[in-house]
């Protein structure tokens, strides 16, 4: 233990590294999303150059900001170019967009003189997830039917859900919008019928939505032609079928078991004819009124083209039942706008880089990573996967598995808020485009209020921005390493189930199973473990030693594994006695493979844990003899240490675990030298250190 404490990573690294990532890439990425800004006539254009942005030195340091009740921030300047195509003029100038709050060395922000910490939020990662839905068939609620759903989750924009209901109909669902038949949605996104029905192994399933309208008991598609539909029974109650026969040959076909008519559906699925089983003559069905349908009349419930699908989608979401010839074009255009705005506009819908990576991997697609919006092929292939999940050929996703969850660090949350501020700035600029007179200057269009207002809202009112817990150094440390599932875009403490609150096998080495609050927030607010880190994708990783033929390769360093990479690995415990040459003990060794504990020979081991402290958090690792504690008492002990009043004069713990020094050092409450060396002089004003390192 005495040696291992020096390999423990910096405890505040998560906060500092995430903010560094925001300054290096996140800010530039967010500014590029609003580039360029043009007016409606396209003759005025403002272009920003985010790669060359500059931050002016802050007016106060973090300590002075606290004393003066100011914000520790710096001014953000970006070069901007205004192009006037009417006068063929180009103006260039540096403009101030706003003030960016800076993070201190200790990993917190100073806003209006108060130290604030941004909590790390753990949410479902962007991508595609398959889940199971259970429906009650009867009123007794004893008979359950299992159905499945596919859900597209985006970083920004509307979530889309493809669900199969208990009648086996497939629907496209959005929040606050009536559900739409999947055929309409796919055709509305631009797919043709030929591609649609040839790409799916079960094209008949897309027609199940129309059985209710046609009142057919069962419908099946002939695989060879994909154009012939068979009905087991002859009764088609409210459907009007047309006939090109003479009136003398017309007979009324009634519901009878003797007749099994063939319903011929042509390529646009709009004309149907009925046949008698043993005769070649055509028998059109009468409607309930006894009238035959007009030859030009078509079944209004099936869309035979993208244009028709767009009309139906818009009429569905606006609850407009009747579509006349006058407003057909308007409806189609509005439906097209609606689909584009919801899923195909990069300004309103964004899967993110990791969302596109996840989608390509799950659906075996090769779309470019720059394609951050949803495409028709994403939805089409997801439909095919959903049908395979229903057949049992593919499995559903475990949403509690950490491979399906992402951590939103402070950089991600600030970047999202800056995106909101830049959107407001863009709207301001567009409104000023309409009111300008004469030759405008660049400064006329820009204001610091939109960006500053958005950041002020975030730091002041967002539940993830909290006053720093300053009871003692440990309280500060754990506050900066906290993970929560609450907050905007997360779960609600009132509706959270035990599955969300429980401990998952993938939590090992990533989320502490002990440290969590008591009460309503139990299991929803957690702590990062001692050795864990968050990679740029937002996945929590934990280190292991590689084991090669039974020998632990300590000199090779740590191998950080995410939950997905660890799934198939066989991992040995970190407290095994090794030989002098680094070999694991002979005989059977207790190991873990995902959620199973078993024993194997050392040659089968892939990795070894780096320390017994790996599975617990910083606060829990301060509890002496933790292995002898009851779990509930250990939880209370870990929490109550944060409430301890600090000593006026620091003392070493009588009973300690060995990492107290690191916690005090990383908290920033002690004086730290830039490099190690020999102390040569100490006074009330300075400490002089002689070091062997020349440049530091």
From Swiss-Prot:
This is DNA-directed RNA polymerase subunit beta N-terminal section. PANTHER family: DNA-DIRECTED RNA POLYMERASE I SUBUNIT 2 (PTHR20856). One of its GO terms (cellular component) is chloroplast. DNA-dependent RNA polymerase catalyzes the transcription of DNA into RNA using the four ribonucleoside triphosphates as substrates. Belongs to the RNA polymerase beta chain family. The gene is rpoB1. GO terms for molecular function: DNA binding; DNA-directed RNA polymerase activity; ribonucleoside binding. Its EC number is 2.7.7.6. The keyword Chloroplast applies. In S.helveticum the gene for this protein is split in two. Pfam families: RNA_pol_Rpb2_2, RNA_pol_Rpb2_3, RNA_pol_Rpb2_45. It comes from Stigeoclonium helveticum (Green alga). It is found in: Plastid, Chloroplast.
């Amino acid at each position: 233990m005495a040696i291992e404490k020096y390999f423990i990573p910096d405890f505040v690294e998560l906060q500092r590294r995430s903010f560094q990532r925001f300054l290096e890439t996140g800010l530039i990425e967010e500014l590029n999303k609003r580039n360029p800004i043009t007016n409606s006539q396209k003759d005025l254009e403002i272009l920003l150059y985010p790669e060359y942005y500059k931050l002016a030195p802050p007016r106060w340091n973090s300590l002075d900001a606290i004393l003066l009740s100011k914000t520790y921030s710096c001014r953000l300047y970006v070069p901007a170019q205004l192009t006037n195509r009417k006068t063929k003029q180009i103006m260039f100038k540096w403009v101030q967009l706003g003030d960016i709050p800076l993070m201190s060395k200790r990993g917190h922000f100073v806003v209006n003189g108060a130290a604030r910490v941004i909590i790390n939020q753990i949410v479902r990662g962007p991508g595609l997830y398959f889940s199971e839905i259970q429906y009650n068939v009867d009123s007794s609620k004893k008979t359950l039917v299992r159905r499945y759903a596919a859900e597209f989750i985006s970083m920004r924009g509307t979530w889309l859900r493809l669900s199969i209901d208990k009648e086996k109909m497939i629907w496209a669902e959005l929040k606050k919008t009536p559900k739409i038949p999947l055929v309409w949605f796919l055709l509305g996104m631009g797919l043709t019928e030929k591609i649609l029905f040839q790409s799916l192994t079960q094209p008949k399933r897309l027609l199940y939505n129309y059985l209710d309208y046609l009142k057919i008991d069962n419908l099946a598609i002939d695989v060879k032609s994909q154009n012939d539909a068979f009905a087991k029974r002859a009764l088609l109650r409210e459907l009007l079928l047309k006939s090109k026969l003479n009136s003398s040959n017309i007979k009324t076909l009634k519901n009878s078991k003797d007749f099994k008519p063939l319903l011929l559906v042509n390529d646009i699925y709009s004309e149907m004819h009925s046949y008698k089983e043993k005769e070649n003559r055509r028998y059109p069905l009468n409607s309930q009124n006894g009238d035959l349908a007009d030859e030009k009349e078509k079944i209004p419930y099936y869309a035979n083209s993208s244009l028709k699908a767009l009309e139906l989608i818009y009429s569905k979401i606006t609850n407009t039942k009747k579509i006349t010839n006058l407003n057909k074009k308007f409806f189609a255009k509005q439906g097209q706008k609606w689909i584009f705005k919801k899923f195909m506009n990069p300004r309103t819908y964004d899967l993110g880089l990791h969302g596109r990576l996840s989608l390509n991997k799950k659906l075996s697609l090769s779309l470019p990573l720059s394609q951050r919006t949803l495409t028709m092929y994403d939805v089409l292939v997801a439909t095919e996967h959903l049908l395979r999940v229903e057949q049992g050929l593919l499995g559903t996703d475990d949403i509690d598995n950490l491979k399906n969850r992402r951590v939103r660090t402070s950089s991600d949350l600030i970047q999202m808020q800056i995106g909101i501020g830049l959107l407001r700035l863009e709207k301001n600029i567009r409104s000023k485009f309409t009111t300008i007179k004469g030759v405008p200057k660049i400064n006329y269009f820009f204001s610091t209020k939109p960006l500053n207002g958005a950041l002020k809202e975030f730091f002041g009112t967002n539940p993830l921005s909290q006053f720093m817990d300053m009871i003692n150094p440990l309280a500060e440390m754990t506050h900066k390493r906290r993970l929560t599932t609450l907050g905007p875009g997360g779960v609600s403490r009132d509706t959270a189930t035990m599955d969300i609150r429980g401990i998952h096998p993938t939590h090992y080495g990533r989320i502490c199973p002990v440290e969590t609050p008591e009460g309503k927030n139990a299991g929803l607010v957690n702590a990062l473990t001692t050795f864990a880190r968050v990679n740029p994708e937002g996945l929590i990783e934990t280190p292991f030693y590689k084991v090669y033929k039974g020998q632990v390769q300590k000199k090779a360093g740590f191998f950080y594994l995410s939950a997905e990479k660890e799934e198939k690995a066989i991992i040995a415990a970190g407290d095994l006695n090794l030989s002098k040459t680094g070999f694991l003990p002979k005989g059977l060794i207790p190991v873990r493979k995902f959620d199973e504990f078993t024993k194997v020979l050392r040659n089968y081991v892939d990795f070894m844990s780096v320390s017994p402290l790996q599975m617990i958090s910083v606060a829990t690792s301060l509890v002496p003899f933790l292995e002898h504690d009851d779990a509930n008492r250990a939880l209370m002990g870990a929490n109550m240490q944060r409430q301890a009043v600090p000593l006026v004069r620091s003392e070493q713990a009588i009973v300690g675990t060995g990492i107290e020094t690191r916690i005090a050092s990383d908290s920033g409450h002690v004086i730290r030298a830039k490099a190690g060396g020999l102390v040569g002089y100490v006074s009330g004003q300075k400490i002089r250190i002689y070091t062997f390192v020349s440049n530091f």
